[in-house]
Amino acid sequence: MARSLKKGAFADESLLKKVDALNAANDKQVIKTWSRRSTIYPQFVGHTIAVHDGRKHVPVYVTEDMVGHKLGEFVATRTYRGHGKDEKKSR
């Protein structure tokens, strides 16, 4: 079920404060966050945000095309190792 339009998009308050502080200082630092559920706002564009994938922080450079999506969409949490090989085919 989608979020109500009257509520607006969600973004973690601490993440917004960090981005606004970097924008005010005109600084480009990597912002580390665990908030995969945060929506990407237009003021995030041009920043690199390190999003947690469950074991490490993966850097994501935010572009204009990402606005409106969630941070977690751009970092995979599971590694796909492929399906098992058939012993008969390998001989």
Curated annotation (Swiss-Prot):
Instruction: Name the domain of life.
Output: Bacteria
Q: Name one Pfam family in it.
A: Ribosomal_S19
Provide a GO CC annotation, any one: cytoplasm
Example of a GO biological process term = ribosomal small subunit assembly
PROSITE patterns cross-referenced by the UniProt entry: RIBOSOMAL_S19 (PS00323)
Task: Could you list this entry's UniProt keywords, alphabetically sorted.
Answer: Ribonucleoprotein, Ribosomal protein, RNA-binding, rRNA-binding
- Tagged with keyword Methyltransferase: no
Record has rRNA-binding as a keyword: yes
* Record GO terms (molecular function): rRNA binding; structural constituent of ribosome
Query: NCBIfam families, per this entry?
Result: rpsS_bact
Q: Which PANTHER family match?
A: RIBOSOMAL PROTEIN S19P FAMILY MEMBER, SMALL RIBOSOMAL SUBUNIT PROTEIN US19M
Q: Which family does it belong to?
A: Belongs to the universal ribosomal protein uS19 family.
> What's this protein's function?
Protein S19 forms a complex with S13 that binds strongly to the 16S ribosomal RNA.
Name assigned to this protein = Small ribosomal subunit protein uS19
Organism, scientific name: Lachnospira eligens (strain ATCC 27750 / DSM 3376 / VPI C15-48 / C15-B4) (Eubacterium eligens)
